[in-house]
């Protein structure tokens, strides 16, 4: 995917390039409404296109949430999955300041969902896990040092 969109920063220009890059590995086939027999089956040589294409839009958009989502939305095929993954990844990389405020406000109001607190909770859990891992590692290092 990286090579397919190297130097491309326009999501519209990236759409045919990403489609061409994933096509040899795609289980669905060229006609999304008339899927091939192997569609969506686990394979060592094929891939479900959504995640690779979403990552492609994150690259093309340079991590910009709005551009990543617009690219994914306009890609077609499983656009809702591609756009939501691209937006989630770009948003996670950039943090709250990278998410368009107007989008966040509209989505929070329409879904009646607090979009900020779950992120704070997940960040807190990640910090707790990191601290516990660091403590376990320090215990391991001390035990190894005691052997030498």
Q: What is each residue range found by the language model?
A:
Residues 3-4, 89, 140-144:
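A glycine-rich phosphate-binding loop feature that marks nucleotide/adenosyl-phosphate handling sites
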Residues 1-2, 113, 148:
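Generic structural signal for short, solvent-exposed loop/turn connectors between secondary structure elements
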Residues 1-76:
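Accessory "access/gating" subregions that flank catalytic or transport cores
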Residues 49, 53-133:
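Catalytic phosphate/nucleotide-handling subdomain of diverse soluble enzymes
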Residues 130-148:
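Bulky hydrophobic segments
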């Amino acid at each position: 995917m990286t090579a397919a969109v190297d130097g491309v920063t326009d999501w519209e220009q990236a759409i045919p390039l990403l489609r061409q890059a994933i096509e040899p590995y795609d289980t669905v086939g060229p006609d999304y409404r008339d899927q091939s027999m192997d569609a969506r089956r686990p394979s060592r040589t094929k891939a479900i296109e959504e995640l690779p294409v979403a990552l492609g839009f994150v690259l093309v958009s340079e991590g910009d949430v709005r551009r990543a989502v617009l690219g994914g939305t306009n890609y077609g095929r499983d656009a809702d999955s591609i756009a939501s993954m691209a937006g989630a990844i770009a948003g996670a990389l950039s943090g709250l300041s990278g998410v368009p405020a107007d989008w966040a406000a509209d989505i929070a109001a329409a879904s009646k969902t607090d979009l900020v607190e779950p992120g704070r909770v997940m960040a807190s859990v990640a910090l707790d896990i990191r601290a516990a891992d660091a403590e376990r590692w320090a215990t391991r290092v001390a035990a190894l040092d005691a052997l030498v």
